[in-house]
């Protein structure tokens, strides 16, 4: 069955067509399917070319969800550090060090905004080439993989940059202040993304469609799963849905390391981003939680429970217990 974009009144935005099992399949795969169904010759299946072109734009919409959060949070963490008395000189030096540490394979330091702009231009060119039949199916699929890879490299370095800044927070102010820092900068994110799940306003059952869809959409945007294409493991239980990521492309990759580029765990040198050393309520009462992963507890469980007595989702994260330990390597589960 063809995959296309449609409007969701429940969510208030355009979404991908398909049942829940289909939503667990990466948008990259769906673009490839539509391209192959369309073929290289203009004719009856021309609409499948248009479907695939629109899905390329939607791939960028998924990526945007993550890019904007990373952009807003990274700036917020830095503003918080300045408010706590860190000098601009010290902060700029640390960010510059991290940008060099996150250099691309060709040695180019991380510069997020120019990379995002270039990604948008490349994706737009791909969509136009698909629509106009200027690209064969084979050429379009090859270019799609280039777009995906460009986003993966930018995504991963942006996640690492945030993890590095959070490690700087811990070094300067101690582990307990991570919670203070997160709470200070997450409010716009909570308002935009999670206030619709306030059960004082809307019964939980009526939010399930939105909750599950935006979870799958965001994790496709993170490019989770084998080969970093955005494929998700989705299980329907009698009383709940379970989604798993192998790997989670942010915190899970921070703990495991990056097989795509052959680099090691960000807990270890040369990164040394660290993990939670003292069990706390906002770290699932566990040690070994990466600093980045703690936001999932705060945003999805702790803060919603404080405000309306009910979590948005529950999370069972991987825990650092050393390289290759099963707890480190396990799937993240929501």
Language-model features, listed with the residues they occupy:
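N-terminal accessory segment detector
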Residues: 1-295, 299-333
């Amino acid at each position: 069955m063809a995959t296309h974009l449609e409007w969701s009144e429940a969510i208030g935005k355009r979404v991908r067509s398909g049942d829940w099992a289909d939503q667990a399949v990466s948008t990259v795969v769906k673009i490839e399917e539509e391209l192959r169904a369309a073929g290289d010759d203009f004719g009856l299946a021309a609409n499948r070319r248009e479907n695939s072109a629109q899905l390329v734009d939607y791939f960028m919409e998924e990526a945007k969800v993550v890019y904007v959060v990373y952009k807003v949070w990274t700036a917020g963490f830095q503003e918080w550090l300045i408010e706590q008395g860190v000098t601009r000189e010290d902060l700029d030096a640390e960010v510059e060090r991290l940008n060099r540490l996150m250099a691309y394979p060709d040695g180019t330091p991380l510069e997020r905004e120019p990379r995002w702009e270039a990604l948008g231009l490349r994706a737009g060119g791909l969509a136009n080439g698909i629509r106009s039949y200027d690209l064969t199916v084979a050429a379009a699929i090859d270019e799609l993989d280039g777009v995906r890879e460009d986003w993966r490299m930018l995504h991963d370095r942006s996640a690492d940059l945030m993890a590095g800044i959070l490690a700087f927070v811990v070094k300067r102010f101690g582990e307990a202040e991570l919670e203070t820092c997160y709470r200070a900068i997450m409010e716009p994110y909570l308002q935009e993304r999670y206030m619709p799940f306030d059960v004082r306003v809307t019964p939980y059952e009526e939010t399930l469609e939105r909750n599950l869809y935006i979870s799958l959409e965001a994790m496709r945007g993170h490019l989770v799963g084998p080969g970093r294409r955005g494929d998700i493991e989705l299980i329907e239980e009698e009383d709940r849905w379970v989604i798993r990521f192998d790997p989670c492309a942010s915190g899970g990759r921070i703990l495991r390391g990056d097989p795509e580029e052959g680099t090691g765990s960000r807990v270890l040198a040369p990164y040394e981003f660290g993990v939670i050393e003292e069990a706390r309520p906002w770290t699932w009462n566990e040690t070994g939680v990466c600093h980045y992963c703690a936001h999932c507890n705060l945003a999805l469980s702790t803060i919603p429970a404080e405000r309306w007595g009910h979590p948005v989702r529950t999370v069972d994260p991987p825990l650092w217990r050393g390289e290759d330990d099963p707890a480190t390597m396990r799937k993240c589960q929501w």
